[in-house]
């Protein structure tokens, strides 16, 4: 549901600040229409493809957490921007088990947990680093084989097993809706994630709240908010259209 041509490149701090304010206003309005408190929804600016020096402008515009898909790109930016106080990183893309050490070293949260093996690798590396990590389990709600995430019916077993990993703080679920102009098909993905989260909450291990729903991007976040999103991942509507096609970051 994204027409990237409608997102002009933000080139100054003021343009970024204005885009952030515009998106926040749209989030607030979507919450009001849904009868929700706007404070329930967090805006996660997604900075993939943009170089570290450009992200200094985003920091100056008010960004204090940035989302990245590719771990090597994220890790390099973290190293280059370590001088920026209180800047946190959220890794939202698929992660290979052998790259868990990088996430454990610097990320504040990870939105794409999709296997017990990856959870174990993260927990081991976090123990070495003496850190903790907020994680969300990625669910494939579209049924598309090309998308990452576990099938919804696998979620109860994985959630139950995650309780053994003391360095992981399981916060909720994440999904990518299908890439479709059919708004109701997109909505169906979000409804499915919310209903799954609600069903899991009643049987979640002690201390596991499962309050977060990470769903919705630049083209569909208002639908996601109407269906219960607590984190919306916004890139192009803040920073401008990306040169790389979505297929570079998300499987088709």
Positions of the model-derived regions?
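Gly/Pro- and small hydrophobic-enriched strand-loop and loop-to-helix capping segments
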Residues: 229-250
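Conserved alpha/beta-domain cores
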Residues: 2-219, 227, 239-241
